[in-house]
Amino acid sequence: MTTVNTDKRILIMAGGTGGHVFPALAVAKYLCQQGWQVRWLGTAERMEARLVPQHGFDIDFIDIKGVRGNGLLRKLAAPFKVIRSIMQAQAVIKEFKPDVVLGMGGFASGPGGVAARLSGLPLVLHEQNAIPGMTNKILARIASQVLCAFEDTFDNVEAEVVGNPIREELIALGDSNVDPVTDDALKVLVVGGSLGAKVFNDLMPSVTAAVSKTHSITVWHQVGKGNLQGVKAEYQHLGQDGSVNVAEFIDDMEAAYRWADVVLCRSGALTVSEVAAVGLPSLLVPYPHAVDDHQTKNAQVLVQAGGAFLLPQTILDANKLIGKLQILASDRNELAQMGLRAKSAAVLDATQKVASVCIRLAGKD
């Protein structure tokens, strides 16, 4: 068991979505292994409130929500809420006395980052997406060090490209995931996020039925909360229930990636980084309502490497999906080459790079 050194303390701010929380957890676990004491700053209503304690880390909460909105009362109240949340973050910092603060996105990062600088602490920012969120755009002006996953993420701010931290088990999977090309059924992993992706749920039953007429295909489809029965019934109606595993959630993504030949998914930053790390080809459908369309830019890294196909949702239909899957089912050599090209775009030491910057700025190297 790692001995925690109470003279090495870091406050990590990340929350709201898995794209923020899981990379931060990777860094937290690495630093914990190096003897650091880790404390988390988040919000009580978002996923970090459940996930962070499950992974063994203490978490403090501040009261802050998104400030984008058009209501007059919302706009008038926003400055007072932000000031209150900064004061709450300052209280956490005063009690915990961290040596460095790491912000990785989410509502708590804004007030926490300001509180860190007001307290005279080094602030490290990490932006996971190819286009930064509003909070990181603002904090980048006052941060001690800005890190990012992709080239040309920030305008007029010097940032070091380090990649996205991902779980160690997925990096290990990528090292062993180079399987020989086989003539077995094409294994398609469909991942739509915690709420599922309606476009995948609507199209994949008929797509699977069409592809199965010419090629052997099996599907593992994560449909999201509340969608299980409807999607499962549609697969059954089309006679595909025997070749499909339909689930609301996939708890073990390592097992899912190990099983898959190709992934149909959104192009959130974490998903893109994980697919690259495990060396899987992908069909990327960016979420069309993402802020600043950042998912399309995220996808370009794998598309330009030749490891993925980009399928904008505005032009996506069953025929396009059928065509892509038939091509991949027919040419297993190309499927394998796409996986290798995806792997070539992966950054596998991002966790260590982020941690080393935090250690250096804390003066603990």
Curated annotation (Swiss-Prot):
Predominant localisation class: membrane
Record membrane topology: Peripheral membrane protein
Top-level class of the enzyme under EC nomenclature: transferase
Binding residues annotated for UDP-N-acetyl-alpha-D-glucosamine, in chain numbering: 17-19, 129, 167, 194, 250, 269-274, 295
Pfam families xref list: Glyco_tran_28_C, Glyco_transf_28
Pathway entry: Cell wall biogenesis; peptidoglycan biosynthesis
Name by which UniProt lists this protein: UDP-N-acetylglucosamine--N-acetylmuramyl-(pentapeptide) pyrophosphoryl-undecaprenol N-acetylglucosamine transferase
